[in-house]
Amino acid sequence: MITTQSISDIRKQVTAWRLKGETVAFVPTMGNLHLGHITLVKEAKTRADHVVASIFVNPMQFGQNEDLDAYPRTLADDQAALIEAGAELLFTPTPDIIYPKGMDAQTFVEVPSISDELCGASRPGHFRGVATIVCKLFNIVQPDIAVFGQKDFQQLLVIRTMVEDLSMPIEIVGIETIRETSGLAMSSRNGYLTTEQKDQASQIKRTLNNMALSLKAGLLIKDVVAKAQAELVHVGFRNDYLDVRNANTFAIATAADKDLVILVAAYMGSTRLIDNLVVKLAY
């Protein structure tokens, strides 16, 4: 696997593959890779001739009081994992390479409406940072396919919308959330949890499952949400949001909707965890 910080090196290699009529899949990450990331790379390998990955801890998507400096940097381990998974090219730019004029002078991409709700409301500017870096990386790599995890459901929808609105010729593939044996969604931030907190955090998935059963049984959405919020508080969470949306439009769900997604963000100690569950009701 070739590792480079150079935009021109990335473009030269991708161009060489293109001249042979070969396809390229892309998996952008912030590093500190776990099995969820590796699953994305392996899936990408089945969908294209070549896989490009990136590792960039994007300062634009972190808020003032968030953990940018504390975010783990584990490049050597990440490289070994990517090689084993089948990636052939790794882009590891620095902030100076991505934002040479500084972030305040950087042209940005913002997807309206979706970016301002839930995680966007809790983390103002977060999705502008996500959309901007993903747009830049897409322009640098120019992949045929890009693979993302569904754990970040709202982020995936933001990226799909950006690609559609800007007429980017890229297929966006979402992969089902990879979980630990306890049911806890795999996340780089799980490393911040103590053993006891990880055990408590596994309640998120059980709560989502209980909500799905209640919704399928025809209970009112507001009652299902209220009960679930209480469950999470009982095991030690501080709720950020818990909501049920239309899985296709992201509008607040109504009794008439059949394709739903339950989305949750909650704090265990100082660590913010997110998860979701898609629920299909009978027509």
UniProtKB/Swiss-Prot annotation:
Cross-referenced SUPFAM superfamilies, in alphabetical order?
A: Nucleotidylyl transferase
UniProt xrefs under Gene3D superfamilies: HUPs, Pantoate-beta-alanine ligase, C-terminal domain
Name its pathway: Cofactor biosynthesis; (R)-pantothenate biosynthesis; (R)-pantothenate from (R)-pantoate and beta-alanine: step 1/1
Taxonomic superkingdom: Bacteria
EC number(s) recorded for this UniProt protein: 6.3.2.1
Q: Which Gene Ontology MF annotations are present?
A: ATP binding; pantoate-beta-alanine ligase activity
Location(s) in or outside the cell: Cytoplasm
Where it mainly occurs, coarsely classed, is cytoplasm
Enzymatic reactions: (R)-pantoate + beta-alanine + ATP = (R)-pantothenate + AMP + diphosphate + H(+)
Q: Which GO terms describe its biological process?
A: pantothenate biosynthetic process
Residues that bind ATP, according to the entry? 30-37, 149-152, 178, 186-189
The record's Gene Ontology cellular component field reads: cytosol
Q: Any miscellaneous information on file?
A: The reaction proceeds by a bi uni uni bi ping pong mechanism.
**Protein family (similarity comment):** Belongs to the pantothenate synthetase family.
Task: Please give the function described in this protein's UniProt entry.
Answer: Catalyzes the condensation of pantoate with beta-alanine in an ATP-dependent reaction via a pantoyl-adenylate intermediate.
Looking up NCBIfam families in the UniProt record yields:
cyt_tran_rel, panC
Q: What is this protein called?
A: Pantothenate synthetase
Origin organism of this chain?
Answer: Shewanella pealeana (strain ATCC 700345 / ANG-SQ1)
- This chain is encoded by the gene named panC
